[in-house]
Amino acid sequence: AVAQNADVVIIDTAGRLHNKINLMNELTKVKRVMQKVVADAPHDVLLVLDGSTGQNAFEQAKQFTAATEVTSLAVTKLDGTAKGGVVIGISDQFQIPVKYIGIGEGIEDLQVFNKYEFVDSFFK
């Protein structure tokens, strides 16, 4: 990224399950390597949670926050029966703001999180 003069680097950790210790250790190593190049990296760590996983999302948030210091959340799959209520507890317990929600599969379905609309959706 430095050689390319890139301002933004996106690292997709798809497949890094919180219960796979070796993969989580690799994620921690990626963070350390980045900090050798840019001392205060990473600047933003977005944890994407599946809104249909329920209470398992708490453990995911705990493990990923310990490994990478998550700075914001996105919750996906809120277009089905999942309401994603667990995200309220995660945001509160770990003091991580929710930035985005996913309500479908298209790019237009990734929306900026609105807390008022989110709460209203529980009563519809």
Regions from the PLM with identified roles:
Residues 1-124:
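P-loop/Walker A NTP-binding module and the surrounding RecA-like catalytic core of P-loop NTPases
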